[in-house]
A protein has these predicted regions:
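C-terminal terminal-subdomain/extension
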Residues: 69-137
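Compact nucleic-acid interaction/catalytic patches
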Residues: 24-30, 35-75
């Protein structure tokens, strides 16, 4: 598949269909993800993303971080979120940067792209802590 969008940067928040493991077929429900890394390849760009979920926000486990409107309105706004979310750094998947997995949400301020926002500087320490904790497990 040809490249249809600009490649995201680490720290961007994108809209995607979390794959059903182990098949890696796109799941049914779009959700936000943090871009951890990007690998440029001749056969197509690969993106490592961190799983986002809106459930159980009050029970953060090791390797998880939440972005909520009440606790950090600046980070919430810059992330482009429509609802509070937590990201689980224990669930990282590598996916091709294509319209099979990534979708353009309705009313996207960034235009015709899956990017919905980016991480705010005030949340970076919590992000790093969650990432390191997940690696240590």
């Amino acid at each position: 598949m040809s490249q249809i969008w600009k490649i995201p940067a680490p720290g961007d928040i994108v809209w995607y269909l979390f794959p059903e493991i182990p098949d890696i077929k796109p799941g049914p429900k779009p959700r936000p993800a943090i871009v951890l890394s990007v690998e440029r390849r001749e056969v197509g760009d690969q993106v490592s993303v961190i799983y986002g979920i809106s459930r159980h926000l009050m029970r953060l486990k090791t390797g998880e971080v939440a972005i909520t409107q009440a606790k950090n309105p600046a980070a919430y706004a810059l992330a482009g979120l429509a609802y509070d979310i937590k990201f689980d750094f224990k669930v990282i998947v590598n996916l091709p940067w294509s319209d099979r997995y990534f979708k353009v949400p309705a009313r996207n301020p960034y235009g015709n792209t899956p990017k919905i926002g980016t991480l705010h500087a005030t949340i970076l320490r919590a992000i790093e802590t969650a990432y390191r904790a997940a690696l240590a497990r």
